[in-house]
Every structure is written in C-alpha cells, then in structure tokens.
Amino acid sequence: MTTTLGARDAEAAIAGGTLLSAGGSGKARAPKDRAFAEKAFSLGPVQLAPIDALPSDADLLIATAVGAPGGGKHLANPDHSIRAAKNLVAASGVSPGAVIPGHVPGIYAWLLAAALKVPLLDAACNGRGHPTVKMGSLGLSSRPQFTLFQCGVGDQVQITVQGNTLVTSALMRAAAVQNGGLVMAARGPLKAGLVREAGALGAIGYQLGLGRALLDAGASPASQIEAALRFTRGRVLAQGVVVVNAVGYREGFDLGSVHVRDEATGEEVALGVCNEFMTASRDGVRLATFPDLIAAMDQRTGEVLAISEMPPGTPAVIFAVSKRDLPMGSGIYDPAVYPDVEQALGVELARYALDPQA
C-alpha cells in the first residue's frame, strides 16, 4: 500500500531518524532535515511504497551524503543533492523507478523521490547510521566485479565515478575531503530485487514508528527517554555526565572518543567514535559494538545528542540497542567493510559485529 507522506510524517522521521543516526545527528540537524522535507513537498508528493510495489528488475537510486557529520565544514544543500541524482541519471542512462536512503534519517531520499517523481521505498541500505559507503553497499563490497555509478556535488567539486564499490567509495571520500568535509551524493542504479534480498526492509516504517513514539511521549525528559528505550528495547549503559569529548575531524571522518561517568557507580563508559558511536566499553570490557545502535540523550531536555553536542559537563543517558532488534542490510555483515574503520579507530569491530551471538 502506497502512502502519501506529509509534514507530521516528516517530524516523526526527523525525530526517529535523529536517534537512529547513533550520534551523527542531534538537535542542530533537525532544521536542516526539515528544510529538505519542505523542499521535497514543494516539488511534489512524497509517496512511501513497499518494496513489492516494484518488479525485481526495476532500477533504484540511493540518496546519501559522504563525509563527516560533525567536523565537516560544508553544509548539506538540497540543490546539490538533486544535481547529484540528475548527474547519475545522465551518466547511467537509466530512469530510476524509486529511491531509497543509504541510511536513516534519510530525508535526502524524500527530496530525490519528489524531484524525480518516483516513490520512496520503505527500505534502506541500513536502518541506522553508518560511517562509510561500503557499510551501506548491500554486500557489494565483496563483489568487485559489480560496478555502479556514484555522483557527488558540493560547493567546490562535482564528481561522477563508475567502478566497484571499494574503488568508487574511496574516490567519493576523497572528494568530500576536498570539499571541506561533505558532498551530497547519489549512487546506483541497483535492481529492486537486490534491495529486496539484501536491504533493510521496513527501515522507513521503523523510523516513523520510533519518531511517533517520541512525539507522543510528552515533553518531559524522562518520558522521552523512556519512550525511546521502550520502542527500541534499549538498555542503559550509563546515566551521568560527559567527562571527555576527544573527537576531531581527520581525513573525512569525525574520529575519537567520548567518556561518560555514571552518576550512580562513578564508572566511566568510553564511546569510540567514527562519525557515529561505534563502540562502548567499561574498564576495557566491550558493552556494545556497531552495528548495535549506541545513542545519547540529554537528561535535561530528553533530546537526542549528536557527538558534536556533548562537551564535558553535558548530562547524558547512553543506551544501546541490539543489532538483532533493528532493520539491517546485509552490507553490515560483510567482512570487507570493517578494516578501514578499524584502522582509523584502532579497535576491533568485525570480531564483534560478525558474531551473531555478540
């Protein structure tokens, strides 16, 4: 069943998607996403359709951005997003039948669906934020013979590349660095059948459901936090105050760590960061590892906190959601997507991420 999305849905998508961005987005992101949604609605209806609405051989386009959400200096631009999509259509010669986001919040995909006059599918490459294109590649990082287009647009650069996922993703990351940290991007075309087999099906519906739960929870911080925990089946890792935020921008990523001291125990939980929260540890013991969702909420306001919004002294609740309770694409379980992030962070990820029992 196809649903026409409106302003109330956009608010739910922003609320739910901000939490699912795992520290990549916070309250400062909401006005930007709202502007993308308003631009989308000005261009035409945004229609959410199930994956089964398209035949398996239909071509899809993925809407995303490449870069560092906190440290990058270049800001998201709706016109750049549309241009990236149109450049991809021109380069590939394919007319897409629908659009999906690389990951939530994914409001860029709403814009491209409206601009291209095609549906937004209830699917994503991942139903949570991830730091690299490869992690949203639907398993194609281990298939070097598979080629696709990636297009990026920024104030200082436009790039169109064709090749396998590993090569084109490296070039897109380099373009983002040259543009000050971020480019608006599109990639594809991919067949609907591949997304049906390997995508995070129902990701938009999950995002909207979480957002509606937050919007309906009431204004008190405690009710916001409780609604998030209840909907996601999350578990609290620490409730206290930020004591360290040592995250900085390097080579296209926000990298470093955030430490939160629990007010009840005095123990610190260390959060490893590569654009998003990737690990949580206490006394050297791993508590959660990407693709588990690790999120932060402000105890004073109940708002979701971005990593860049957590200076020392910030009162925060840190919680984790099991990867088994989230809509995930198969790219998350591809060993080829972890080495560069492990190297950047200096910690193991794949051993935990690929263990179904972890």
Curated annotation (Swiss-Prot):
Transmembrane segments: none annotated. Pfam families: S-Me-THD_C, S-Me-THD_N. InterPro entries: S-Me-THD-like_C (IPR048350), S-Me-THD_C_sf (IPR024071), S-Me-THD_N (IPR010318), S-Me-THD_N_sf (IPR027479). It is an enzyme of class 3 (hydrolase). It comes from the Bacteria. The keyword Hydrolase applies. GO terms for molecular function: hydrolase activity. Keywords: Hydrolase. SUPFAM superfamilies: CV3147-like. Its EC number is 3.13.-.-. It catalyses: S-methyl-thiohydantoin-5-propanoate + H2O = hydantoin-5-propanoate + methanethiol. Desulfurase involved in the catabolism of S-methyl ergothioneine. Catalyzes the hydrolysis of S-methyl-thiohydantoin-5-propanoate into hydantoin-5-propanoate and methanethiol, the third step in S-methyl ergothioneine degradation. This is S-methyl thiohydantoin desulfurase.
